[in-house]
Design a protein with these regions (language model features):
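Conserved, single-site charged/polar hotspot
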Residues: 1-346
Length: 346
């Protein structure tokens, strides 16, 4: 370089120093900006999601000798049908057919696991393995689905059958045994520990983040009671100063654990059941002779959130990712491993 006719020479160490300073000026600001990029809904939770379950048995042909005895509550009779036909009727009844295919696969896997575990545990009632109501899993026949879906029947059924066939014969296991694969509609942002809701601890039914549920139309709701009805249902007295009850503790899943009333304490589960609330995540306020209860989520909150599963699927997660997130430490095995122990009817 010539400056004013004089030649200026740069030493090699000086050149390296200048180059490093230029690099720092460019790189450091970029590094500072990147961590503050706005994350997508569910991205943080998804990053913590366990990898897809390994060693998954391929969907296979299921022995049609494995039949499920279903007590049809309305007809007051037992109907016996092949396993995969039963699972199809459950998935169609329990999850919206418009949901992502990977969410429907996760639902099929949970539904099949639920009934296999129930059949292995025995204890029939009304000579049936399960009922067709929410006491177990809702099941509807093809005739009932035709009435429900109308012109959408063919397309909906085809999609459901695809989800079932892609998981045919697969069940979720923990420590070599089919799990109690509970599921529900919508969380409050976290699922619930089984021990906190039912009192029984299951190592695979632990509280996990489920931020995708915020997109559910069932995420929040309000119910209004008269003070008289509220008191009658709960067997408590509401104080004259407007204090409805003191919520003492919350569970790990951010739901009400205990509520103290005057001379009486109820669990969040008891309050939910007595008031028929959508969730045990609730708050309330008194407005004159009314009590307004606001809830977050829909269902008991234990196991797989259906709207959470759909949110994960919409982000590109596979059904194996979904079940690995909601059921901790599980494996996927073939139902054929338990065929000899199942109640087989010919």
């Amino acid at each position: 370089m010539d400056i004013g006719g004089n030649k200026m020479k740069f030493s090699k160490p000086l050149f390296i120093t200048v180059a490093l300073l230029i690099a720092l000026v460019i790189i450091v600001p970029a590094a500072l900006v990147i961590p503050f990029a706005k994350a997508k809904v569910g991205e943080e939770a998804a990053s913590k999601t366990p990898p897809a379950i390994e060693s998954i048995p391929a969907p296979g042909k299921v022995d049609t000798a494995v039949q499920v005895a279903v007590y049809r509550d309305q007809q007051k009779k037992v109907e016996t049908l092949p396993m995969e036909e039963y699972v199809t009727g459950v998935v169609a009844s329990e999850m919206n057919a418009s949901f992502e295919i990977e969410a429907l696969k996760a639902q099929a896997l949970a539904a099949r696991t639920f009934v296999v575990q129930r059949m292995l545990s025995g204890g029939k009632k009304n000579n049936a393995d399960v009922t067709d109501t929410v006491k177990d899993q809702v099941y509807k026949s093809k005739e009932e689905l035709k009435k429900q879906w109308g012109n959408n029947y063919e397309n909906n059924l085809k999609k459901i059958e695809e989800a079932v066939s892609k998981t045919a014969g697969q069940v979720l296991t923990y420590d070599g045994k089919p799990i109690s694969a509970s599921f529900f509609s919508t969380s409050n942002g976290r699922t619930e520990n089984a021990a906190d809701y039912w009192g029984n601890d299951y190592p695979y039914l632990k509280s996990v983040d489920s931020p995708w549920d915020q997109a559910s139309p069932k995420f929040t709701s309000e119910q209004t009671f008269t003070v008289a009805d509220f008191q009658k249902r709960l067997g408590v007295k509401v104080l004259a100063d407007g204090k409805v009850g003191n919520i003492k503790d919350l569970t790990e899943g951010k739901r009400v654990k205990d509520v103290a009333f005057q001379g009486k304490t109820l669990t969040g589960k008891q309050v939910r059941e007595k008031l028929d609330l959508r969730s045990s995540d609730f708050t309330w306020k008194q407005e004159r002779d009314k009590i307004v209860v606001t809830t977050k989520g829909f269902g008991h909150g234990v196991g797989m959130s259906q709207y959470g599963a759909n949110g994960m699927a919409a982000e590109g997660k596979k059904y194996t990712d979904i079940v690995a997130h909601y059921y901790k430490g599980v494996e996927i095995k073939s139902m054929n491993d338990y065929e000899g122990k199942l109640m087989v009817k010919k």
